[in-house]
Amino acid sequence: GEERVAFTDSLGRTVQIPKELTRIAPSGSVATMILATIAPEYMVSVSATPSSAQYRYLPQNLLTLPTTGQMYGSKSTLNLETLLSCNAQLVIDLGDRKENMEQDLDALQKQIGIPVIFLEADVAHMEKMYRTLGSILSGKEARGNELADFAAETVDMAAENSAKITDEERVRVMYTSGVSG
């Protein structure tokens, strides 16, 4: 079989992942969008069919990939058959840390027989996440570092700009969503 290396994800789970990694499946919509920025040609599936509004922003190969659904959690719509037919080497979950994720991801990994990792991808972890993806995806180190540098600059710029805003200038906004979104 393929050579594997031990990888410790953001939850502290150590997972054996392929050393040469070129076939990845996103666990959901956040992972789909982020992975499309670093290695769209390595993606073997998407979580959902992109909307026509998203078409022009996405790498064209994503538009024809099979959809596997949201892979776990209360809103799980995993299409196991589709996922298994994609021949993914690794399932990547990106986003915010949630309760019981370790158990959820271990259970998913056991169910599908494919290694599953989680990387925290909120604003504070974006730089680290891109560097990590760059280091595990074959030939993607330079792209990962480029995206990580961009993420770091953006966060620094936002922090600098928000520090310049006085209390009087600060805008107060409440964002809510109703039953229909």
What annotation goes with each model-predicted range?
Residues 14-17, 64-79, 115-126:
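A structural signal for short loop-to-beta-strand junctions that line the ligand-binding cleft
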Residues 11, 19-21, 39, 47-50, ...:
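A mature extracytoplasmic/lumenal domain signature
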Residues 1-20:
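Short, low-complexity disordered leader/linker segments with a strong preference
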Residues 12, 19-42, 165-176:
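A short, flexible N-terminal coil/short beta segment enriched in small residues
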Residues 25-27, 44-47, 90-94, 116-120, ...:
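Structural recognition of the beta-strand scaffold that forms the well-ordered cores
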Residues 31-86, 90-97:
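A short, structured surface patch at a secondary-structure boundary
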